[in-house]
């Protein structure tokens, strides 16, 4: 359904940014949800959606006309596709451009999140959400994720160019890191190196809950910390 969103357009006095809002209502009985994001350079933030909403977004975009939104529902599964409209050679640090995308998700369903973005900043606190899988494909970016412990297994896959990546994982969850990349500076405090490119926390095999992190990056600073 391409029309299931509210639209509000305005301009910011300093950045000439278009302001738009979008929303998708949660279908009754939905247990799992899939979110596909496509976007260029922007700062991506995450908040909880209002009751009754599966997904919502608040965007403030300079130099970009907005996003397209599509929603599908089948049985107990609901899918949202949210993609930035085409842009021409605009970078995040272009002078005078302000682009921020605040995503809002319902905490009830089990989520599969897939993001393909250009250069950008991404900061997500995922602790309130049941995230079974999150896949990030980015160019030059700063990625900051805080993962939770609401599922027995969660998977994180990151493919990036030049990136600063920081991931926080709970102390009570076993965690495995697989890393493939040319030039990576890494900080995996609390992990044991099993072999080249493979790291695990102590007691991983017997942990009741597990997080699997798989990264493939060009040149990155990569930190995984326990909390």
Predicted regions and their residues:
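Extracytoplasmic/periplasm-facing segments of secreted or lipoprotein envelope proteins
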Residues: 28-31, 41, 117, 157-159
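Active-site alpha-helical segments that house and flank conserved acidic catalytic motifs
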Residues: 35-37, 115, 179
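Extended beta-solenoid/beta-helix repeat architectures
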Residues: 106-110, 116-119, 126-140, 148-153, ...
């Amino acid at each position: 359904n391409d029309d299931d969103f509210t639209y509000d357009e305005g301009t910011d006095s300093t950045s000439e940014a278009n302001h738009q809002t979008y929303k998708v209502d949660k279908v009754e009985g939905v247990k799992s949800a899939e979110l596909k994001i496509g976007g260029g350079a922007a700062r991506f933030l995450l908040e909880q959606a209002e009751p009754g909403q599966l997904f919502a977004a608040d965007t403030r975009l300079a130099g970009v006309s907005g996003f397209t939104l599509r929603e599908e529902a089948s049985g107990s599964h609901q899918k949202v596709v949210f993609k930035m409209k085409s842009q021409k050679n605009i970078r995040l640090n272009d002078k005078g451009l302000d682009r921020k995308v605040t995503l809002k998700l319902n905490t009830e369903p089990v989520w599969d999140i897939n993001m393909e973005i250009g250069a950008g900043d991404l900061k997500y606190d995922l602790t309130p959400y049941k995230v079974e899988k999150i896949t990030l494909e980015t160019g030059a970016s700063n990625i900051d994720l805080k993962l939770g412990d609401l599922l027995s297994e969660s998977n994180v896959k990151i493919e990036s160019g030049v990136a600063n990546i920081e991931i926080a994982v709970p102390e009570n969850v076993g965690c495995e890191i697989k890393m493939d990349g040319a030039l990576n500076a890494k900080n995996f405090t609390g992990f044991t190196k099993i072999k080249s490119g493979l790291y695990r926390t102590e007691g991983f095999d017997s942990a009741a809950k597990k997080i699997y992190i798989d990264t493939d990056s060009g040149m990155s600073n990569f930190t995984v910390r326990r909390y």
